Amino acid sequence: MSNLLKIVEQDYLAVQKALPEFKAGDTINVHVKIKEGAKERIQQYQGLVIQKRNSGNGASFTVRKISAGIAVERIFPTMSPFIDKIEVLRAGAVRRARLFYLRDKTGKNARIKEKKKPVVEAAK
């Protein structure tokens, strides 16, 4: 049975959507398809990635945002057909894979420094 699952997973991973590389600590904008009756629209969910689970087709990531002073966390399956696209807005400089300690912090204490990018000198 496990061999059959591996074969099916390989087929799905071969046709996997081209998603950008991101990790815990990055600020991302997820475009989610929302169905309301017969209509379908796209809603943007912007927040901080606090964890990323990589396990084949069961991969998922958790995004945390503050909305009207209330923290909201949402778990997105990576292979979900409801995800239209993902944009990486900022790369955070963190040393952990799971940022659950941010749940206890508020305001300025919950900020994450931005990762420094290497300076490219102009060609003369």
Swiss-Prot record:
Q: Which GO terms describe its molecular function?
A: structural constituent of ribosome
Cellular component terms (Gene Ontology) = cytosolic large ribosomal subunit
Question: Which GO BP annotation is one of this protein's?
Answer: translation
The answer to whether UniProt assigns keyword Ribosomal protein to this entry is: yes
User: Which keywords does the record carry?
Assistant: Ribonucleoprotein, Ribosomal protein
**A Pfam family for this UniProt protein?**
Ribosomal_L19
Q: Has keyword Thylakoid? A: no
SUPFAM superfamilies, per database record:
Translation proteins SH3-like domain
Gene3D superfamilies named in the record:
2.30.30.790
Q: Which InterPro entries match?
A: Ribosomal_bL19 (IPR001857), Ribosomal_bL19_CS (IPR018257), Ribosomal_bL19_sf (IPR038657), Translation_prot_SH3-like_sf (IPR008991)
Functional summary from the UniProt entry: This protein is located at the 30S-50S ribosomal subunit interface and may play a role in the structure and function of the aminoacyl-tRNA binding site.
Q: What protein family is recorded?
A: Belongs to the bacterial ribosomal protein bL19 family.
Report what the protein is called: Large ribosomal subunit protein bL19
